Amino acid sequence: MSADPARAESGHTPMMQQYLRIKAEHPDTLVLYRMGDFYELFFDDARKAHRLLDITLTSRGQSAGEPVVMAGVPVHALENYLGKLVKLGESVAIAEQVGDVATAKGPVERKVVRVVTPGTVTDTELLSERVDTLLLAVTRQRASYGLAWLGLSSGTLGLSECGERELAGWLARLGPAEVLVDDRDDAALTAALSTTRTALTRRPAWQFDTALGRRKLCEQLRVASLAGFNAEDVSAAHAAAAALLSYAEHTQGRALAHVGSLAVERASDLLELPPATHRNLELTQTLRGEDAPTLLSLLDVCRTGMGSRALRHWLTHPARVRTAARARHEAIGALMERGGEVLREALRGVSDVERITARIALRQVRPRELTGLRATLLALPALRDGVPRDSALLADLAQQLSPPPEIADLLQRAIADEPAVLLRDGGVIATGHDAALDELRGIAQNCEAFLLDLEARERNRTGIANLRVQFNRVHGFYIEVTQGQVDKVPADYQRRQTLKNAERYITPELKAFEDKALSAQERALAREKLLYDGVLDALQPQLAALGAVARALASLDALAALAERAAVLNWCCPEFVSQPCIEIEQGRHPVVEARLAETGGGSFIPNDCRLDANRRMLVITGPNMGGKSTFMRQVALVVLLAAMGSYVPAAACRLGPVDAIHTRIGAADDLANAQSTFMLEMTEAAAIVHGATEHSLVLMDEIGRGTSTFDGLALAGAIASQLHDRNRAFTLFATHYFELTAFPEKHPRALNVHVSAAESHTGHGDDIVFLHEIQPGPASRSYGVQVARLAGMPAPLLRQARATLEALEAQQAASASQIDLFAAPPPSPPREATELERALAGVEPDTLTPREALDALYRLKSLHERSKEN
């Protein structure tokens, strides 16, 4: 049986009727239905949870004549199971008991208090500390795609628009945890999403409404116009924002009070980084999908999670305009000069103010998060004083570390020094903050002292020496008197229980105390919740101030991390110039260099790279394993690091304007999308020749190797010509086709270089030593047989390969002529004129009368019709 809302409710028990009504409101979501100490799932939800979580599936009783299939998870273990479901891409609605069990007639009232989805997770245990969890909405309007994204745990809100070609690049750049799309078919969007592993949620198309989105954005940002955010002209993004904000508010069950700023990111403002570039340069993930070793893992020595998230954003969103990068370079230099390590040490104890602020707004913050916030706010003055003021950026960030003092004051007064982990455990509100709470706590905590005092007073009053005042859970508080002393009992004693050897009584004073004591703990917890809510209420107006502090701390942490990396790894400050050039002196691959240092693999060999207006392409040849790909990647990484505002691994660096980094490296089949090695190679190459400009950096590694030799050689030559002559992009073109070393002879802006190697002749055969140096001119040979020997190929196989190679080389040398790949195409043979062309050639317009001209026109028309039939 499924949880079908259309099923007649009258056939079900009252509780199942309630459940089915809730399930009908969340048909595509797993519903966790609170029942006492468990969250239960029913019917198809239970079967699915059993499969995903490996929890027990059972059935209990009947409803509508069928067994009720169910599975449950304990309340105390909710976060664990919730995390597993969200990681599997599931969305979960949590239905809590909101009614009073004591007064309920029928099932206690329940309602969904929040919906947890992969893109709207805010629970600390379910979030990655160093990655922002983004919810993205995408919709198409004519030729443009509108994008709107939200980091619910950080309060970030962004908009953009792009064309079909850039869509996959935006998905790679943002890395969303969940994508909202409308329920219309869109082949391009489906294709772009197929390259990701993100959770996909379809929403009705009417929710993606431009006017609604504009209105919701204005309401969210509390403005009358979006002009102040430069967001008036992105109507497709407004439509995406309508669905995004509605969905986020629905999942949280409340307004998003902490979202108060908006960033509009335009593709023309950012350095273009297509998905292949993210993948091939291993920016945030290795080619195997691991988090390290990557460029980000090398850079990220941040002290806080929010610093790590800021650093990741800088890396994946580098700007074409260099203003922000220059400011960061200046700040890094100042921190390297003085104060950087002191600042990093001060940041060590800073809490995640960004996420705590979001959880305050969503009223999900835990007591110990507030104590962490309090400690951070109290440490800000000393931290602020330690920030160097030698750069404008650092001075501005330091100035933002001055939140209103009443925030820390409130937290000091209201929250205990060491509160319980959860509010429900009590002991959260500080003693002295509320007199009523202190009294209730006093009753509960001083119960034993009161009983001893009452016992002493009653013994003295009655003269009964063995009188005892006690408590048990069945009868509550009582005064116990043995049967032999009953005649001394005062008149105000009321009999509560008769035992064989004693009588138990209660007095008005003890009854009054009992009423207070038995309910004191419950009332104290209720009072604490009320006071805690009051603290959160008081913090709501301070969310913007806390957000500013969080952003400043995150930026300082990221800058201090980059300064530490620059100092430890011996990086230099790049110079930006207006002339077209990429000039790198003694450049290194940062990740490879670090790995060599870690593993004791020797020193990295640095290399120069010079590209300018008259030198736009390097044709790179040399042996496999010689370092061609490493050299190409290191040039791209130096350019990217400079653009994000980092120092770079080089002795010196001058960079002109760069608008994109395109890469075609690697030969792995894309089996998931039914693309062979060669098809993937050509698809990526096509995207590059269509998208690269004279300001782009292009890496082409071994293009054409996925097909036959002649096909591959012809295509490689044509692609090189296109990039050199038409795109005019800065290009590093590595190839195993030695015929392409003739390319620079007819292309003046191209130059041959090679990675060097040396041979040594031993009794075991020719050995090869890779020197990893980039030197002028083409390589003399590829050393493929020597590399095969290093790989462990059998000696007989190597002898056969060497003999075949020598024969082929001799055959090539004896060839009388070679194909010129770069000559103009040969002229086509002359073609015999058609009857229509001959008739047209015989017409003399200047000698025709009007009548003759009309006849000629009809004759030509007739010949044309006949030619189509043939």
Swiss-Prot record:
One of the GO BP terms on file: mismatch repair
Residues annotated for ATP binding in this entry: G622, P623, N624, M625, G626, G627, K628, S629
InterPro entries reported for this sequence: DNA_mismatch_repair_MutS, DNA_mismatch_repair_MutS-lik_N, DNA_mismatch_repair_MutS/MSH, DNA_mismatch_repair_MutS_C, DNA_mismatch_repair_MutS_clamp, DNA_mismatch_repair_MutS_core, DNA_mismatch_repair_MutS_N, DNA_mismatch_repair_MutS_sf
S-S bridge residues: none
Keywords, comma-separated and alphabetical: ATP-binding, DNA damage, DNA repair, DNA-binding, Nucleotide-binding
Molecular function per GO: ATP binding; ATP-dependent DNA damage sensor activity; damaged DNA binding; mismatched DNA binding
Pfam families reported for this sequence: MutS_I, MutS_II, MutS_III, MutS_IV, MutS_V
Gene Ontology cellular component list: cytosol
Domain of life per record: Bacteria
The keyword Transport appears for this protein: no
Similarity comment text for this entry: Belongs to the DNA mismatch repair MutS family.
Role, per record: This protein is involved in the repair of mismatches in DNA. It is possible that it carries out the mismatch recognition step. This protein has a weak ATPase activity.
Listed name of the protein: DNA mismatch repair protein MutS
UniProt organism field: Methylibium petroleiphilum (strain ATCC BAA-1232 / LMG 22953 / PM1)
